[in-house]
Amino acid sequence: MSVRHIMETILNTRLRKDKELQRLIDFFEFGSCLDKRFAALSGGQKQKFTIILVMMQKAELTFYDEVTSGLDFETRQRLMEKMAEWYRDKENTLVVVSHYYEELEQLADKLLILDQGRVIACGKKEELFRAYCGKAILILENTLSNRDLVRDFTALKSPDHLIALSCADREEEERITSILIRNNVNFKRSNSDIEIMSINAKEAFYEGREDK
């Protein structure tokens, strides 16, 4: 059975008459898959198929649980960009469960951070970032020379290969960036890095606790 027939059967519709379904298929560039057998679809194409079926329900509240699990980075990125674009001007509420921070940065405006079943933090993304990271962070490679260069500034918890510097205000940010630029150090600025924010939220949650 072709993907087209499976889709029409599940949705109880006919593609040639369903303008909304046609629009979703065009939006996700899925037209070339319609005459294939489902087993012949790639992982990314199967995820598109599932997402189209979900979106056709027009639900006020939709759960996406690890929707890009098993896909390569490039396919994940393209799929999440498409989802973010589709929902941008809509009033639907999405609950997205993901271990990929870049997905949450694209789709989420509120976060619930869990660790081993414990609620670490919950709130608006911007408020959580400010609470655990500051106004902005500057991220650079973790090298001996870089550590020495920024030793007088506040370093946040971060992945081992990175240094993340907290900037409490514009003046501090300008002071740090001036030093980095003067010393020809590559860096990235962020005011929404969910990975580093989550690491520091966990650090604050477990600080002083014996049940880590």
Give names to the regions the model predicted.
Residues 37-41:
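Conserved ABC ATPase signature
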Residues 62-65:
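Catalytic Walker B motif of ABC-type/P-loop ATPase nucleotide-binding domains
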Residues 168-212:
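C-terminal coupling/interaction segments
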